[in-house]
Amino acid sequence: LWVKKNGKLTKKNSITKPVDINKNPIIDTSLFEESRLYRPMAGKVYKMYPIETIRGCPYTCKFCNSPDQMKLYKGLGHNFFRKKKIDLVYRELKYFKDVHQIEYNYFWADTFLAMNRKELDAFCEMYQEIKLPFWMQTRPETINDYNIEKLSKVGLHRISFGVEHGNEEFRAKILDRRWKNKDIIEKLKIPHKYGVAFSVNNITGFPTETKKLAFDTIELNRHIEADNANIYSFVPFHGTPLRKMCEELGLIKPETITKCLTNKPILNMPQYSPEEIEAVKKCFSLYVKFPKSRWKVIERAEKNDTEGNKIYKELKQEYLEKYMPK
């Protein structure tokens, strides 16, 4: 907390040691309406609860606040990344299942599989007693046959993976995600081997990105047999390395406050306009699923005019009939 008076800094509290998440009490959900526990998942609605296993993330993606959090606390001799003890995770799971009749758990850790094999085995042994389906999110490089097979046997129902961008050089340099496309493709063949559905998340509209680079993301997704693929506009949040980059490039003012949900892309870049970003997002699923022989028609559907909207409506209906689960 900083306090200013007459334009002068009067007090600056020092940053304290991160909260010990193993000392936190179980959240009292009785404060909220029961209806808030119901959430959709893959076409169904479940009574669902978010469970914390870790806080923070060991990775340093530049669109995320994790790098600055880690750097800030490391400079003070602390570690922002923390894991909850498995017996406490079990206590929460058991409590919400028995007291609130939870039907489905979702683990909201940024990277659920940021754990070693011993920790994974302990989780699976513990979760055998819970016997509820669950969702997790993680990175493609964290999965293997061993952990997905074990998790599938105790209730893993669905996974979300962050792929983010399809150009290897751009992804490494701008996002600090250093993995080969061929490795991502191979890893994402694993979930379906064990009957686990998954989605992939992508982002477009990064600083210095072009529409041509965005099509590398489309191309990568064409080689991944995801149950669904999502794409979102980049948001330059304060406290992230890419926010600093955007300010240095003059793409956003330092005082501009961003929101999680935006009506349109925030960055107005000459090489990749907000209109182009929106067009890529609008037709992303069509480009990913339809054969390339249809791309010229899809390109016309990008246009927000009478003819473009008519073509888009027809393609969307075709997509729903062919590719959406009945």
Residue ranges and their predicted role:
Residues 159, 249-258:
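Flexible glycine/proline-rich, aromatic-decorated loop/lid segments
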Residues 56, 196-201, 224-229:
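Conserved beta-strand->loop/alpha-helix structural units within folded catalytic cores of enzymes
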Residues 1-18, 233, 239:
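Glycine-rich beta-alpha loop elements in corrinoid/cobalamin-binding modules
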Residues 241, 254-326:
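Radical SAM enzyme core and accessory elements
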Residues 29-198, 219:
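Radical SAM [4Fe-4S] cluster-binding motif and immediate context
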Residues 112, 163-176, 188-213, 232-238, ...:
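Conserved strand-turn element in the central/C-terminal portion of the radical SAM core barrel
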Residues 14-15, 24, 62-64, 119-120, ...:
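Short aromatic-enriched loop/helix-cap "lid" or pocket-rim segments at secondary-structure transitions
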Residues 147, 207-223:
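Catalytic cores of alpha/beta
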